Amino acid sequence: MANLERTFIAIKPDGVQRGLVGEIIKRFEQKGFRLVAMKFLRASEEHLKQHYIDLKDRPFFPGLVKYMNSGPVVAMVWEGLNVVKTGRVMLGETNPADSKPGTIRGDFCIQVGRNIIHGSDSVESAEKEIGLWFKPEELIDYKSCAHDWVYE
């Protein structure tokens, strides 16, 4: 079997406030991915600026940081085969108007500025984001009893 990879998923303040945390976790679990780490926190502006550093020159950057700092987020690390790519498909397009029904954004979002969830866009950015949000000892290594029922 190919190597399992990890991705960073964050439920944004609007997803938390709308009570969608359980539904989002459920979808990742039902897909067969394994939760490796999770924390509930209100990220500082400095932390968010570091997370979104690649967007710092975009006109929407200050509003994005303010929005992400407006309430608590749920930061998670998920593990599985092709979890980065599959996770992005599960999330839907960044703009919910372009997202298909059945995706998280297609089912729960209307506007791009309130798209409820973030997911790493590559294995490299996942590694960077996981390192920014979690200490190594916060990543829990265990074998799920469902592993052999999900993977050949």
Curated annotation (Swiss-Prot):
One of its GO terms (biological process) is positive regulation of epithelial cell proliferation. Its main location: cytoplasm. SUPFAM superfamilies: Nucleoside diphosphate kinase, NDK. GO terms for cellular component: cell periphery; cytoplasm; intermediate filament; lamellipodium; mitochondrial membrane; nucleus; perinuclear region of cytoplasm; ruffle. The active site is at H118 (pros-phosphohistidine intermediate). The keyword Ion transport does not apply. This is Nucleoside diphosphate kinase B. Keywords: ATP-binding, Cell projection, Cytoplasm, DNA-binding, Kinase, Magnesium, Metal-binding, Nucleotide metabolism, Nucleotide-binding, Nucleus, Transcription, Transcription regulation, Transferase.
